[in-house]
């Protein structure tokens, strides 16, 4: 019986030819070990002060983070002019930078303080941000809904280009999410250069949605891949269960596929299987140890 892992290994060489073409959407230099720049998505550390966050990330052992700056994040949009510089300063004191800002932005609006958030980020040296998802409604044809997105996307890309910061879209599984299947959002992206609109590509969600065809989703996103997300999962019946990076269906074969395509951009580790929050006794140490273990796995895959 051919497993998903076997399929991944046997298709990597063939897909290398399919991927040959345009360069990365946003190339980044390699990490200190000669591998990629590795960031950490710090959602599981929300609730720490800026200094506490910087200290925890330094203990984990990465030099950059993807920082949530959205409702419920490290910094709220309403406070971004004051608090984001403080966060950047605290991180810099520990040799850490922000490689990606996670936002609630998918259109130019006062509600999300789009221009203020993006201009503040750019002024602090942040080069890219993750967009919020677009959502489907069950009450309207899908193609018509994609057409409705186009003006909002056009205005956001134009503002981002003016500011000099790159918008990135994550493929997230689920029937309501535009981009879950990749093809729909990829069709909208074709109107723009990769430097102006890119993917934060999530292999977990691609595998969940793609079944045996997920390598085609990777190939479709590859020329616009600004950052590659790493996390893992298991199926519990029909339910997706997040798990440590070493324990799920995704393995080092995916890294071989990226290497075969000459991917040299940054990668980001997501630790999404922990229960609890930083306010609970013992959680922080557990989160640091889990992050370290996943980081060691990720580095071993790239070695």
Located regions from the model:
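Hydrophobic faces of well-ordered beta-strands that scaffold small-molecule active sites
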Residues: 36-42, 65-67, 98-103, 129-131, ...
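Glycine-rich, proline-tolerant flexible connector loops at the mouths of alpha/beta enzymes
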Residues: 68-86
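Histidine-acidic metal/acid-base catalytic patches
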Residues: 2-37, 48-58, 125, 182-201, ...
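Catalytic-core regions built around general acid/base machinery
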Residues: 83-90, 152-159, 217, 254-257
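Mobile, glycine- and charge-enriched loop segments
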Residues: 29-44, 88, 92, 97, ...
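Active-site beta-loop-alpha junctions enriched in small/polar residues
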Residues: 41-45, 68-72, 103-106, 134-136, ...
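Active-site acidic/histidine proton-transfer and metal-coordination neighborhood
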Residues: 11-20, 51-54, 71, 94, ...
